[in-house]
Curated annotation (Swiss-Prot):
Membrane topology, from the record: Multi-pass membrane protein
GO annotations of cellular component type: plasma membrane
Name of the coding gene: ycdU
Chief place where the protein resides: membrane
Organism expressing this protein natively: Escherichia coli (strain K12)
The entry's keywords: Cell membrane, Membrane, Transmembrane, Transmembrane helix
Name listed for the protein in its UniProt record: Uncharacterized protein YcdU
Length: 328
């Protein structure tokens, strides 16, 4: 007996709420640590941006996931009978639009709390209420997406290649990284303007790059195969979405060897960038300097992400063909 929609989401929402709170609190916790356990008023937009991007990441593949659920019919969707989509609803639930609107809402909430309470109490309440706001928006958007699935078959391919798809995801995660580490521009360990080539600066940047990469790699543990299967059903991608797996030989090597090679390259790269910055007396923002030093890790993350998601896409294609065979 298949569960009805309301029963299924009642069970699923328990996990969703935990995931949203866990991710939101981890990111805000890293921000707070990097800010020296302070919360200046100019960082209200930073915290709100982090939470808004959490929502964006949660809903980016959400319609595709529910397309997979609808097509495979392992949930009873009779609750949606006679429910219609409205044009304004279709517009407001687009990931970019929903993310931008959530940014405005979260910024307004954060500013209000900051005006009423001491800064640390305000941040504490933002950490508690922000993920809850994201969860409530997520629920509303999910309901809209399920209604949209029946009319959402794309007229043309939305993502022509896995490389572009991965690039978009990497850009979003990089923005989250920059927002999270931005308070370090005021840290004694990273105030290196005019003193780029120091042992302290190089080691601090090396550790920071390693921590950021480790967090990003941790979130790659979540599989994309059902999202890709849903996008195949929606015809947003085709079977030529990814034809080959780049650097498969490299990623077949043991993890410790890959990380050791990356460590050597990263040390050499940070040293080279520091030498150049000292010679030309650069005056650039800390975020830009970090991003420049992070390039080897960013390249590794991009190709590893593509490697994993290519395998997920191959599994999605196999499931897609099996489903077509069973429904002949």
């Amino acid at each position: 007996m298949i569960p009805d929609y309301l029963t299924f989401i009642r069970f699923q929402d328990k996990r969703n709420l935990i995931y949203i709170y866990a991710i939101g609190l981890i990111l805000i916790g890293f921000y707070w640590k990097n800010a020296g356990f302070t919360f200046p008023s100019e960082d209200i937009g930073v915290v709100s941006g982090i939470l808004a991007l959490v929502l964006y990441n949660f809903i980016f593949d959400l319609k595709a996931y529910w397309a997979y659920k609808c097509v495979t019919k392992n949930i009873d969707f009779s609750w949606f009978k006679k429910k219609q989509n409205h044009k304004i609803e279709l517009f407001l639930t687009q990931p970019l639009v929903a993310g931008f609107l959530s940014l405005i809402m979260l910024s307004a909430m954060s500013w209000g709390l900051y005006q009423l309470l001491p800064s640390l109490y305000a941040l504490f309440l933002i950490s508690l209420l922000g993920p809850l706001v994201i969860f409530l928006l997520f629920r509303m958007i999910r309901t809209s997406y399920v209604k949209q699935v029946a009319i959402s078959v794309a007229k043309k391919v939305k993502y022509k290649s896995l490389t572009r798809y991965v690039l978009l995801s990497v850009c979003i995660s990089t923005v989250v990284n920059l927002l999270t580490i931005s308070p370090l521009r005021n840290s004694d360990s990273f105030v290196t303007e005019g003193q780029w080539l120091t042992f302290k600066s190089i080691i601090a940047l090396l550790i920071l790059c390693g921590v950021v990469l480790a967090i990003n790699l941790f979130f790659l543990r979540f599989s994309k195969r059902y999202a890709f299967l849903g996008r195949l059903f929606l015809q947003e991608i085709d079977l030529f979405f990814s034809s080959e797996n780049a650097l498969s030989t490299f990623f077949a090597k043991p993890l410790w060897l890959r990380l050791f090679i990356l460590l050597v390259i990263e040390v050499m790269w940070i040293t080279l960038v520091s030498v150049l910055a000292t010679l030309v007396e650069w005056r650039i923002w800390f975020e830009a300097y970090f991003l420049l030093c992070y390039v080897p890790c960013l390249i590794y993350y991009f190709f590893y992400c593509r490697f994993l998601w290519h395998n997920d896409f191959m599994m999605a294609c196999d499931m897609y063909f099996r489903w077509g065979h069973f429904n002949k």
